[in-house]
């Protein structure tokens, strides 16, 4: 408790201690990042977050792009009390920053998705237990992020992580994992490489251990901009890196890190299904006709569930005029109440900065929608242009070159017509305030990056990024734009898409078919 009151929190030792406990010193105040393992929370935990926002912050909390929760205005001397309150509901801020193994992320619909191959949550928990306080990997060359997908669709963006894992079955039906290494965004964006097409599940932790040992031994420590594992994999080549991992496996295979059926079952028991009722699917024809707003919301903000009679619901945190991913303390309390009444007391956060109620009875969906409208959670824009991923940017972050939130708001206001928004269809728009890419701009169908030009804020636009299966990095459109021009620029890009698209084509599909030139010509023709 005395440490926050002491000076020198920027000293090497104290800085490492501070960061590995999730505490940043930002532009105007400290920021505390709270760990939310694989995005799962219960109602009591959410109420505690609401209390912290109310008592120690300015009444807000923020969902990050790694499914964590951030408080942007705590006083430094209050941090020990905040951590103590978090501990009462089994929460902490350990390893949410620093050069260590960070929070393992996954699909926000894990365990309920209709297209799921294997529930990834037990594997996320196994990895979490292995990584937390791991003494060998507490001071890596640079931060390290792992994502695990469990479904046919990749909703965990595994191809742009330091390690990405996805379950597969061999010809005999045995479970294993495809293992990807060397992905990442930031200053040097890279789509990772698969180095193992079938890793037996028993060897999962041993293989991760081997990867980390190779990285810890050969990763650069002389230049933090060249220290991520993606730089090492590229320098060695994926093939040579894989050989070094296999050399480590000679010492690890069959050892103490080998997983057993008993251990996997022990962890899996914490992820049993709730007490689902035997329900039939609901025919919404009459309700949709009577309530067009409900029909519109249902088409965008719900997803098929593995159990008949249930549905997963996404609560949009992207209404016009609200910073993407922000919730007030009152909204947090309301979400906790909704989770208890509609979803067995649990909810999830997503890397798209929204909230999910994963187990809603279809017969209660209309009643839930009415409550979500009252709480400001029913904007029917999930997967659409205004469902913007956005970092806090220059309004908060000391690293940012430019503000992000005002850009998001200007675009939301320009595209506030729901009819037009639905006509445009699915599109990912991501905004980062600097090259660290916390807003994942590299993998947005449209990406926006804040840059500094002689002390003025400008914005660079990229097109063609994609975080899903077969990930791709966006291509820079051309010279950057002033803040006041950004909504016009996006409008011109959308106009090209609408003119050029064929039936059922998404923005990314049209871009991949016609290339960047038509977009570039339209945007810059009016500026020169």
Briefly describe each language-model feature range:
Residues 29-175, 206, 317-456:
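Small-residue-enriched alpha-helical segments and adjacent helix-cap loops
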Residues 73, 77-78, 87-89, 216-299, ...:
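Terminal amphipathic helices with adjacent charged low-complexity linkers/tails
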Residues 289-312, 319-347, 486-490, 496-499, ...:
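Long hydrophobic segments that form regular secondary structure
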């Amino acid at each position: 408790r005395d440490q926050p009151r002491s000076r020198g929190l920027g000293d090497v030792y104290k800085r490492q201690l501070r960061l590995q406990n999730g505490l940043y010193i930002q532009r105007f105040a400290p920021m505390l990042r709270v760990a939310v393992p694989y995005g799962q929370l219960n109602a009591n935990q959410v109420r505690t977050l609401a209390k912290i926002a109310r008592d120690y912050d300015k009444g807000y909390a923020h969902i990050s792009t790694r499914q964590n929760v951030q408080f942007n205005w705590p006083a430094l001397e209050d941090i020990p009390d905040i951590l103590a309150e978090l501990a009462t509901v089994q929460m902490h801020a350990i390893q949410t920053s620093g050069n260590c193994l960070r929070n393992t992320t996954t699909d926000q619909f894990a365990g309920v998705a209709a297209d799921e191959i294997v529930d990834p949550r037990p594997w996320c928990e196994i990895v979490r237990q292995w990584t937390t306080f791991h003494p060998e990997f507490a001071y890596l060359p640079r931060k390290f992020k792992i994502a695990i997908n469990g479904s046919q669709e990749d909703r965990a963006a595994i191809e742009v992580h330091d390690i990405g894992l996805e379950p597969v079955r061999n010809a005999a039906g045995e479970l294993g994992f495809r293992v990807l290494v060397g992905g990442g965004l930031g200053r040097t964006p890279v789509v990772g490489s698969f180095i193992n097409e079938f890793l037996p599940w028993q060897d999962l932790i041993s293989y991760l251990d081997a990867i980390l040992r190779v990285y810890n031994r050969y990763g650069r420590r002389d230049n933090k901009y060249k220290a991520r594992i993606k730089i090492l994999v590229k320098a060695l080549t994926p093939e040579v890196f894989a050989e070094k991992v296999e050399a480590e496996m000679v010492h690890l295979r069959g050892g103490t890190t080998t997983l057993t059926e008993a251990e996997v079952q022990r962890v899996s028991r914490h992820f049993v299904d709730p007490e689902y009722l035997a329900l039939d699917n609901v025919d919404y024809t009459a309700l949709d006709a009577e309530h067009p707003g409900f029909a519109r919301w249902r088409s965008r903000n719900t997803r098929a569930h593995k159990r008949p009679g249930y549905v997963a619901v996404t609560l949009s945190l992207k209404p016009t005029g609200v910073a993407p991913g922000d919730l007030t303390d009152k909204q947090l309390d309301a979400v906790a109440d909704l989770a208890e009444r509609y979803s067995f007391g649990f909810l999830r956060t997503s890397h798209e900065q929204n909230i999910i109620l994963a187990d809603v009875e279809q017969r209660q969906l209309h009643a839930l929608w009415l409550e979500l409208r009252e709480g400001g959670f029913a904007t029917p824009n999930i997967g659409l242009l205004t469902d913007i991923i956005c970092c806090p940017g220059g309004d908060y972050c000391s690293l940012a070159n430019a503000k992000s939130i005002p850009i998001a708001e200007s675009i939301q206001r320009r595209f506030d017509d729901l009819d037009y928004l639905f006509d445009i269809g699915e599109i990912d728009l991501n905004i980062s305030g600097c090259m660290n890419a916390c807003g994942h701009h590299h993998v947005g169908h449209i990406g926006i990056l804040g840059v500094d030009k002689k002390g003025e804020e400008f914005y660079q636009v990229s097109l063609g990024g994609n975080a899903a299966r077969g990930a791709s990095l966006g291509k820079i459109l051309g010279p950057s734009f002033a803040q006041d021009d950004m909504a016009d620029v996006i409008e011109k890009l959308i106009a090209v898409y609408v003119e050029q698209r064929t039936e059922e084509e998404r923005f990314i599909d049209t871009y991949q078919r016609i290339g960047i030139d038509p977009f570039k010509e339209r945007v810059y023709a009016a500026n020169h």
